[in-house]
A protein has these predicted regions:
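Soluble FAD-dependent oxygen oxidases
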Residues: 1-291
Length: 291
């Protein structure tokens, strides 16, 4: 950070374009038991859940976080709320309200350690399946979230014919407070400012069993993502940001960083990897040379 600030910035969001990190130095903090967990419900309270999501995203709890998902599996069609607070004694009323929604098929809300919550999430995602991620984002909009449920349900008409298929449309709010806190501890390549918030990262998480279904699944979920982006544009809520860790290989991740950030990434690549080793030889990832 002190000796090569341009490389430090590039590594924070630049994917595998610049080198191999062999050492991390991280600030740590103590953490007592947290409050949180998940609640599984049906689709009937979707409107009220979206309304509470809007409240949280515009007036966030500094100690809380929230994920709201529309889900389909052979066992359940409905919604999932994952809510957490690092201050178990002072949980946001909005989070409490969302986790008392009815009906409930499963409720894991409790006080637990961070590792306990991490294990719970891992247990919900067992290995051995063909798990694909697709992503987009939009500026916070109640109408987008309500209408998105309709296009999600339309996509399922064809997709649910696939044996044991599971699809989730997951909404993760990125608040102004989150962006401000991130910028205070150092710049990165994402090029986000508080004025970009609140916006919402969308993850389409798709799980199927057989390779013979790959082409159908990819095509249909890409179509769902395209319809979602068209909806967001029509509602005046489109966002160019694409979260790299959720991005399918066709996603224009770096384009969402903006021209200034792209120029800095390309300059760092030319300076620290003049032969283009990480562009030509290292497989996978998103290559800055392709932008």
């Amino acid at each position: 950070m002190e000796h090569n600030p341009d490389l430090f910035l590039a590594l924070k969001g630049g994917n595998n374009n610049f080198g191999i990190v062999t050492k991390f130095e991280m600030k740590t903090f103590s953490q007592n038991n947290m409050w949180g967990g998940g609640v599984f419900t049906d689709t009937s309270p979707w409107v009220s859940l979206v309304d509470d999501f809007q409240k949280f995203a515009t007036n966030p709890d500094p100690f809380g976080t929230l994920i709201l998902a529309r889900v389909y599996s052979p066992q359940l069609t409905g919604a999932v709320v994952n809510a957490y607070s690092s201050d178990a004694s002072n949980v946001s009323p909005v989070l409490k309200n969302m986790t008392t929604v009815q009906p409930q098929f499963l409720n894991t809300i409790r006080e637990d350690t961070l590792s306990g919550f991490a294990k719970e999430q891992a247990d919900f995602n067992p290995g051995g399946a063909r798990h694909l991620f697709f992503t987009t984002s939009f500026h916070l909009s109640r109408d987008v979230m309500l209408k998105a449920a309709e296009i999600f349900d339309e996509a399922l008409v064809d997709l649910k014919t696939i044996p044991n298929y599971v699809l989730s449309m997951v909404f993760l709010p990125i608040t102004k407070r989150t962006i401000e806190a991130s910028n205070k501890i150092g710049t990165n390549a994402l090029n986000l400012s508080p004025g970009d918030g609140p916006f919402v990262i969308v993850l389409f998480s798709s799980v199927h069993e057989n390779a013979s279904d790959d082409a159908k699944v990819i095509s249909r979920v890409q179509g769902l993502r395209a319809k979602f982006e068209k909806l967001a544009a029509e509602e005046g809520s489109a966002s160019k940001f694409r979260y790299l860790n959720y991005a399918f290989k066709d996603t224009p991740v770096f384009q969402g960083y903006g021209t200034d950030s792209i120029a800095k990434l390309k300059a760092a690549s030319k300076k620290y990897d003049p032969q283009g080793f990480f562009q030509r030889v290292v497989p996978g990832g998103f290559k800055i040379s392709s932008v």
